[in-house]
Amino acid sequence: SGYSASAFLKDQIARGELSPADVAQLTQAATRFGLGSLGFSAFMAVHAQYLAGRPEADYIANSERLFRRAIARLIYPEARQLIEAHRAKGHSIAIVSSATPYQVRPAAKDLGIDDVYSSELEVIDGQFTGRVVQPTCFGDGKVLAAETFTEAKESTLADCFFYSDSTDDIELLEAVGHPVVLNGSRQLRVIARERSWATAHFTSRGNASGSQIFRSLAATGSLVGSFLLGLPLYALSGSRRDSINFSISLFAETASALIGLDLDVRGREHLWNHRPAIFMFNHQSNADMLIMASLVRRDIVGVGKRELKNMPFIGPLMGAAGVVFIDRSDRTAAIETMRPLVHALQEERKSLVIAPEGTRAPTRKLGAFKKGGFHMAMQSGVPIVPVVIHNSHDISPKGDRIFRSGTVHVDVLPPIDTSDWTTETLQTHVTDVRNTFLRALAQPELSVEETLALEEHTPDDLKPEVRGQTNRQRPGRKTNLSDDDPEQMLQAPVIKNNQPAREQNNGAPEATRH
């Protein structure tokens, strides 16, 4: 959904790499290309000149950052389903794109696609020369790239599916045996009807409708309403705990209904068999708070970033519900702030809900775990219950402004005994617990050494302590609610896909072997 080139251009402007005159020249070139008076290779050359002398390694690192920040959320969940459907049939998959590899490869890596064909920029001695490698992967060049792929797989284009939304790809659509027009332009849809090509339309990304926005605002407001409705219970019973439990359950039911969120839960019995417990969940989405409220329901405390405390209405309500706000940029202060949670676990018999990653992951890949929750488990002696959330990223990916209605699949795993844990063995236990998540998510497990290396090499934009420092340094900045507000409740259509003949053109395969 959308164009990765836009994210790159906006980033270059924001970083001061393009002057107003440069932007004007690029805009003029894009306009001429759109009108057909400038060829694709010439259009690419206009942009490539601005990279001359720049180290490729820096551009690669920046492209990966941009993917995490702005592009990952654009990948259609239906596209992921489609890719898996092709894999299940034993098909080989490639991305064949006119974009540069720096736009395409991060998405390919996230999707598990090794074969990438794109328009290359010339690099000598690790630096861009400002020239484009010919031929570019456009028009007949894209056909040539697809033929290279099929030859390597000992197949032919006649066996291939190819998915596209643009008439720019008409040459390859005509060359393959199974052309599919996906979210096609009006002109391409007309051509598809004339030639009896398969068509499909994905709807789970894009602009929210008025109805979706209204329902989302209502769901967000239901948090306030749910706690207000709990006040009469508190007045009558005098029990703050019963009032909060009532409000949490009411919020979970109301907001889920408004959003259209359903949960498919395996191992639900583990939510209740060993309380109090520390419920650890992998953090993918703004929807996770609602999901955990729906699952755990009562007698809970939580941990949230300090920035949430100052949010109007939401912050005070979260504090009243037992959320402890921590300063992610100050490890010592964070540990001190969390000490009362041991009392809540041991004396008040409340359970702790915590995301060991410390921040939302931009993709489905499990991030590095922080040790705070594990220290809490060791000090309190309560078990850890892993809650594996499979696809809340589909419902509302990091950085998105809306929620999508649909079904989230959750595995609640058996409790893990922590009574014999020690400081000396803690890293081993962290690795073991993280590997239980990885197994459930069908991702490769890591050794202790590999787990430590992952923590060390986690990019700064995925480290909550670094993000916290950034927020402290810029206290007056305007907050991007889609990045910082886990209370946003927006929704969109249910994801349904049963056929391996659907795909999308941004971050998804464009050629597959049948």
Model-derived features: positions:
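Active-site neighborhood of HAD-like aspartate-dependent phosphohydrolases
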Residues: 1-35
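A hydrophobic membrane-anchoring feature enriched in long, contiguous, low-charge segments
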Residues: 24-27, 214-236, 251, 258, ...
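Metal-dependent phosphoesterase signature
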Residues: 42-77, 254-255
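Membrane-interfacial amphipathic helices and adjacent loop/beta segments
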Residues: 55, 241-268, 298-347
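C-terminal cap/substrate-recognition subdomain and adjoining C-terminal extension
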Residues: 61, 68-230, 239, 474, ...
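Catalytic core of membrane glycerolipid acyltransferases/transacylases, capturing the structured
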Residues: 107-112, 118-124, 234-235, 258, ...
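N-terminal signal-anchor transmembrane helix
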Residues: 235-282, 286, 291-294, 448-454
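Non-catalytic C-terminal accessory region of glycerolipid acyltransferases
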Residues: 335-514
